[in-house]
Each structure stands twice: as structure tokens, then as C-alpha cells.
Amino acid sequence: MNFKIGVTCALDAPAGSPFPLVNPNVYETVDFLAENGFDSMELHLLKPSEVDGPKIKEYCQKKGILISSIGTGMAYGKEGLSITSPLKETREKAIQRLKDQLDLASQLECSIVIGSMRGEIPVGRSREEVDHLMIEGCKELAEYASKGKGWIVIEAIDRFETNYLQRAEEVLEVIDRVGSDRLAVHLDTYHMNMEEQDWKKPVLLCGNRLKHVHVADNNRNYPGWGLIDFKPFLEALEEIGYDQTLTLECYPRPDGKTSVLRGLEYLRKLIAT
């Protein structure tokens, strides 16, 4: 096995967020990752204007760090933006924000994550209504992405955080209905532990449409500080030829830097066996 390993990072984040590295100076974060043997970073931004795309790309290249993806969920948490909102104005703002993120992703040649920005199925609305808005929104975004070098990954998220798109097969159904190769699946072991029945089957089902992975233990601490046996999952990734990053998205326990260093050590040992 030979996988790249990265970390979810943010310039700012609410207390309790599973972002182990939070620093308003993104260049210091890149330095830490490079100095400690990481391969990549996932950068969470409220707005893409918070960073200078060409400058951060050049700095990361100089340090040997890949930017794997841009996290977008802060726009949902702080501003309530989702592409399935009952309010047309909110949907339009969400789509525009994601297009702006895709502009940055095109500069960085990476993906954007649609996690919480997909929204939920609210009381009084049907799954079909929400599916329609999700598919129409993703069609527009996929067409926009096709003009640049960025792409979109949709994350399967557990039932305690959303009631919509919780398993790999549900995300794949949306992708199939959109019909664009600019859309792919994003799996997270923390969410999979609650929603999937097997570690291998969802990965094999996704195949080459799996383009992003988060790793955390069942308690959302770093891998190795919980109950998950990661070996079958990693074997399945190897079987499908997964060539993207394993990104640590875990709580900063006992602190951010310690958590990711321990997670890195655990994964490197596991991959080597």
C-alpha cells in the first residue's frame, strides 16, 4: 500500500469542529505539514477570497504539499447556504459561493467538498423535492466545473448530522442522475462506521468514482485512538486503485498537532504492514 496522507486545516473554526489544524496563517500550517512528513492539506474556507490562490499554490509546491480539496461547509454553518434550501434566493447564493470555490479549486487543481451545503430534508418536504433541487444544482455546478480544472466530491454524512445522503449508494445515485464525470464520492470512516454495513463494499461500489477520503476513528479522534479496524478499508482502497489522499479529519485531542502526528504515525505503520 502507498497512500498520500493529509490533514483538514482551517483559518478559523467554531469550537468543537473536527479540524485539527486551525491557524489564520495558512503558510505556517503548510510549514508544519512539510516539516512533519505529510503529503497534503484540505483547506476549509468560508469564502475563497480568504486566500490568494496562485500564492498559496506556489508556496505549497515549494514545500512539497498538495492541496487535495477545499471544504465548503462553513457557508452552511455560518450563513445557512445550501443548494436544496426551500428559498430560491438562498439556493442561488449557495450555488454562486460554490462556483467561487470552484474558481479557486481550478487554480489549485483540486476538488471542492459538498458536505453540509447539500442541506437536509425539512419537515413538510419530500425526498423527491430535495433530490430534484440537489440534482439540478449539481448539474449547474458540474457544467461550471467542466470549464476549469476543479471537480466536486459529495460526502456521505451520518444520520446525526443530516437526514440526506448518508451512504455511498445514495451519493452514487445522485451522481448517476447528474451524469457528469466532474462529480465524485467522498467517504469518511467516521460516518461510514455509523451508516455502512461493511468496510469494503461501499469502496468497491464506488470504484474509480471515489475521489476523496477522510479518516478518523469511531469517536472522531485520530485513527488508532478508537475501535475501528482500518485494514479492510485500506485494502479496499488499494483494490480499486485509489490514488487520492487519506485526510485526517479528527478532533484536536489532546491537541491539534499531537493528534495529527499520532494519526500519521498510526496510518504509516498500518500501510507498511
Regions found by a protein language model. Give the residues of each.
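Generic structural signal for well-ordered alpha-helices
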Residues: 29-31, 53-57, 98-102, 135-142, ...
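Short helix-capping segments at alpha-helix termini
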Residues: 62-65, 144-150, 176-182, 239-242, ...
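A structural motif
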Residues: 35-38, 105, 109-111, 210, ...
